[in-house]
């Protein structure tokens, strides 16, 4: 266990102690104190993180009786928007919805203007977004063991695509390389769309990607999904095995979106938000909307999310470090 993980755990214990203290105090009961509320999404409009955030904003606004406005502040892989929230007042008026990229920043960027744990108050994990191991239908493999054997039988001739260097799909493939004991060329693209196009055309032989981008192609028979990266099978592709079931017992990764507030936001406000979302996000209507973008609802407690973020930072950081992926 690394010294960074131990330091993160010490900060986590302090944060959880604050959450429990304020929760016991009963402060901020009743009306939510901020109106309107800005929900910052550090990516352009229309993407899966943005769509999930807008669903959360709508439900949160209705539950709290306030206006929740989504603002897209993209740049530097999401760090521009995250930095805005890190610098905001912890009064409930500014929130952040970010993907698992939030905990990858320290591993792939040499300079990060905030601490991904200590500069924020964790509120809840909103959703998980399973990644699928995809191959073109023309590739003569039907499962993960056959893919591994194909790679070994064709040294230097198998390449994997990603939506960009350092993202969750890229690092998922790097973990696959390590666990399977194979070497594959990385071909990064500017987004999932061109990568999936080349994958379907056979220009690259495999790709890990979120179901947000790839589910429609799998269901249309244009791509084969050999496995999902989550510990359990996905309800969206129930017949597709997990990586563990497919023969890699140590492999488990989840892409996810979470909700944060600036550091120091009182725990009763945090709990008010979490409870409001928990009451709405598991309804059949919201689940259907999330499934349409390849996501599954979670809504964890602030304490559980705080622990989850620490372990995810360690997990993704280790994968990034092993792969040598950097962006500046």
Residue locations for each model-derived region?
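Short hydrophobic alpha-helices and adjacent helix-cap/hinge residues
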Residues: 4-6, 29-31, 35, 59-65, ...
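An extracytoplasmic/periplasmic, membrane-proximal ligand-sensing/linker region
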Residues: 34-36, 178-182, 219, 245, ...
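N-terminal (or domain-start) structured segment
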Residues: 29-118, 157, 165, 181-210, ...
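N-terminal signal peptide c-region/cleavage motif recognized by signal peptidases
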Residues: 24-28
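Hinge/capping helix and adjacent helix->loop/strand transition within the periplasmic-binding protein
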Residues: 87-93, 108-194, 243, 256-289
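Beta->alpha turn/N-cap motifs
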Residues: 97-102, 162, 172, 192, ...
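A ligand-binding cleft/hinge motif common to bilobed small-molecule-binding domains
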Residues: 102-111, 170, 177-179, 206-240, ...
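Bacterial N-terminal signal peptides that target proteins for export
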Residues: 3-16
